[in-house]
């Protein structure tokens, strides 16, 4: 598989599945760390919650996928290092993206965006980005569309 095809597949899969994995872990975090009754409120607004996570997390997730696709073969061929780089890259890219959005006041005009992007809710951004980066880096070679018989993707699994 060519590098450009791998970049496109990784970027799209990360952009589509990454925010959803982040939402799953965030809901579990809220359920176990806060009161379980708050989960009922989240379930009521789950479609808005998912939409918000996709609008704020798709671009950083796509950039993380592109970064993972461009890893050198020595790092990308080992699952442990690929997951480590994917997790750290997810956090760093998400924080840079959120910092850019905060400085562009037009995009962060709503109170909901300002609340999520503020420094007080760092855990709400870091934990989902870290876990989504790790999980997606782990499962990316098993998703459809990637030619598993190709030596370039065999070295990544």
From Swiss-Prot:
It comes from the Bacteria. Residues 33-36, 105-125 are periplasmic. Keywords: Cell inner membrane, Cell membrane, Membrane, Transmembrane, Transmembrane helix. It is a multi-pass membrane protein. Disulfide bonds: none annotated. Residues 1-11, 58-83, 147-157 are cytoplasmic. It is found in: Cell inner membrane. The keyword Lipoprotein does not apply. NCBIfam families: PRK09823.1. Belongs to the CbrB family. This is Inner membrane protein CbrB. The gene is cbrB.
